[in-house]
């Protein structure tokens, strides 16, 4: 999959099937839209995701978004920051200049509540009207719902901020996870029967509340259940950055330097300060 961040002009793409939105988290609603443009590849179209205006703190990192979309079959991810030009572009001009002119769109998939263009005056009805005139088809999908609430990035963020890993999993179709190279910690966990891995999440990634979670950690060809502390490691003085420290059950390996992906399953309790590392060891080993 090709990833392009739009700084000035859009690339010229021929025969594209496009879906538009923020796409900072690929939740169930986004997935339905992506599936629609993937279907158009059978007609010779390139499947293009146009992500409009990503937040400074995102549910998924750029790497995670790219991997998920590539696995789904997307050909091109265009990330378009909300520059002055884009913010003040009339919806009609957005359709003519970008969708028709630059992307040579043959198919567009959007949700029924999608809005775009200056003052958010662009609507699915407008896309359909222009499609009839300029020869592209617009498919409008209903909102994906959880009960009476629309599934949206805002909904996902709220549940993540609550530490509700089960609801996050339902909305996204996958676990919340943190991944990266295992860092060297202070080397004290092993002394107190706490073999651990340490990860530093990217600064742009939204994190759940500080606390202790049930997790599963994945390394190349093996996985370990464990518990993970998200926070400032208060027992050992407290770092100024958020750390993800995981105790792995039934693991005696030296995993420093390995690539690790930690899937969060359930919130256990808030982060708390212990009187000693011995107390930490005892508490962790006796958790249900």
Identify the meaning behind each predicted range.
Residues 185-285:
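Phosphate/ribose-recognition catalytic cores of enzymes acting on nucleotide-derived substrates
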Residues 131-229:
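Glycine-rich, Lys/Arg-enriched anion-binding loops that position phosphate/diphosphate groups
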Residues 53-134:
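N-terminal Rossmann-like or analogous alpha/beta NTP/dinucleotide-binding catalytic cores
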Residues 27, 69, 108, 168, ...:
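Residue-level signal for inorganic ion chemistry
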Residues 46-48, 76, 137:
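Residues at the starts of beta-strands that form the adenosine-phosphate
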Residues 9-63, 67:
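N-terminal catalytic cores of NTP/NDP-binding nucleotidyl/phosphoryl-transfer enzymes
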Residues 2-8:
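Short acidic-hydrophobic, aromatic-tinged amphipathic segments that line or gate anion-handling sites
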